[in-house]
C-alpha cells in the first residue's frame, strides 16, 4: 500500500483560494452586481472585497497551496486597544485607509442649457456662419437682413444695422480684440463695423456672390464666397484686396487661420479641405478624405499643426490631420452631419455640433476621439457654434431659431510666476 500525500491546512484558512479565482467567480455569477455597478464603482468594490478577504496583498497564485502558507500572518503581540479584534468598524484598518483616500470627482455635464435666447429668422442654411462671441464678451448674430449684438455682461440686446430686405447677412466675425466686426452679405460686399462708434468704417468688394466664410489674421481679413474665390483683404492698404486664390470648385463655407504657423485651412462644398501657407498662393496640402461639404474646421490651440475637420450629411466623419507632415492622424464616423466645431481653450477636447437625427452637441477627447458627452436640446440641426472669451461656455444656434448657452469647461488655471520677488 503506497504513501498518500496530505496537504498542510491552516486552521484559520482551510482552503487558500487566490483572489483572482474568487474575482472570476464573482464576475461570472454576479450579473445583478454588474448591472447595478459599473466602471469605477465596481472596481472600487472589488478592491475593497479583496482587502477584506485576503488582506493588503491579495495572492494571484494557484487556488490551493500544498505546503506551508508563506503569506504574511499577523505576529503575536501584546494586547493593545489598536488590535483589529477591538475595532468597532466592520472593515479592517487597511480598508478604512483605502476608503479615506480622496476620490477624483466625476465630471458632470449639463443636461440643459443655462440660458436660451430666441433668434427669429435665424437661417437654417448649412453654409452660413452667423454667430460669433468676441473678446469684448459681446455676441454678434445675423438674423435675416439685420445684425444684433448681445452683451453677456449686461444682457442687453441692440440692433447694429438692417441692410434691407434684398441683402441678408451671411457671415459675421469679430477681430481678435473684439473692437471691430466683419459682416459678409448676400451681395458679396463685406462691411467692417466699429463697435464703439456703431458705424461702418469700410466696405470691401471683390466677390460676385454671397460671402459665407470669414477669417482674421492680424490686419488681414480672408473671405470665401459662393463664387469659389478666396480673397485676402489687407486693411492697412487703401485698395480692395491683396491677393485672390481659386482652387475650390464649389462654394467656400469654412475658413480658419492658424496664426502661429501662418497657415490657412479652407473647406468647401466640393468636399475638399485645403491648407495654405501665407507666403504662397498655391495650396500646401489637399485633403480629400471627406465625401460631403467641409464647413467645420478648427486648429488645435494646444499642439502646432493639428487640424480637425468635419463633413456633411453623406460623410459624417470627424478627421484629424497633421499639417506639418501632411498625414491623416485619425478619422471617426460620428453618425450624423457635422455642422460646426471648436477646440476647447482649456483642455484637449473638441466640441462638434450635428444635424439629423439627434441634433446633438458632442464632446470628444483628443487624440483618441473618444466620445465624452452628448447634449441634446435643439429640435433642428445645430448649425452655429461659438465659444466664450474665457473658454468656459459655448453658444449654439440651430434651425429651431434659438440660441442655447452651455457651460462645458472649467476655467484655465493661472500659471504660477517664475519671477523671484
Swiss-Prot record:
WD repeats lie at residues 123-160, 164-203, 206-246, 247-286, 289-331, 333-374, 377-416. SUPFAM superfamilies: WD40 repeat-like (SSF50978). Interacts with mes1. Residues 86-98 have a biased composition (Polar residues). InterPro entries: Cdc20/Fizzy (IPR033010), WD40/YVTN_repeat-like_dom_sf (IPR015943), WD40_CDC20-Fz (IPR056150), WD40_repeat_dom_sf (IPR036322), WD40_rpt (IPR001680). It comes from Schizosaccharomyces pombe (strain 972 / ATCC 24843) (Fission yeast). It is found in: Nucleus. Meiosis-specific activator of the anaphase promoting complex/cyclosome (APC/C). Involved in cdc13 degradation. One of its GO terms (molecular function) is anaphase-promoting complex binding. Its main location: nucleus. Residues 79-107 are annotated as: Disordered. Pfam families: WD40_CDC20-Fz. This is Meiotic fizzy-related protein 1. Belongs to the WD repeat CDC20/Fizzy family. Keywords: Meiosis, Nucleus, Repeat, Sporulation, WD repeat. It comes from the Eukaryota. One of its GO terms (cellular component) is anaphase-promoting complex. PROSITE patterns: WD_REPEATS_2, WD_REPEATS_REGION. The keyword Cell cycle does not apply. The keyword NADP does not apply. GO terms for biological process: anaphase-promoting complex-dependent catabolic process; metaphase/anaphase transition of meiosis II; positive regulation of anaphase-promoting complex-dependent catabolic process; positive regulation of ascospore formation; positive regulation of meiotic cell cycle; sporulation resulting in formation of a cellular spore.
